[in-house]
């Protein structure tokens, strides 16, 4: 978690940890993280917190951990999106894969029995069909990293039937 010194972020992280979905790696202001963990009554090895002095350093350290396979995915804590993305897209130390960059937002609905995710709610403003395919591949990779062998995917558009005047429906049909 980049810049993990945020109460809501840590609540979500440790709910996921309690459900055995993740093993958190906390990066950021160690004093603030420690204080929040105590307030939340969470047990965590405080010596494993990676202390950084700035949001920029938190973002860079997070990317370094991904590149060295010491972490599997990034969760944004209390830092500006621009600071995190600067580290992610850095030409020398970033996370370039050859595919488009997209994000995945997870939704926990108390009355529903499954974890739901929505991918790319706005990073790619007008993706073409090939870019949409890459966005889906990114989301599938995230789910596989979380232990889901065959995630179920639905491609959404404004209407359910293919309409040649609506390129999104044509792309959805192809995907």
Regions found by a protein language model. Give the residues of each.
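Anion-binding alpha/beta catalytic cores of soluble intermediary-metabolism enzymes, centered on
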Residues: 1-175
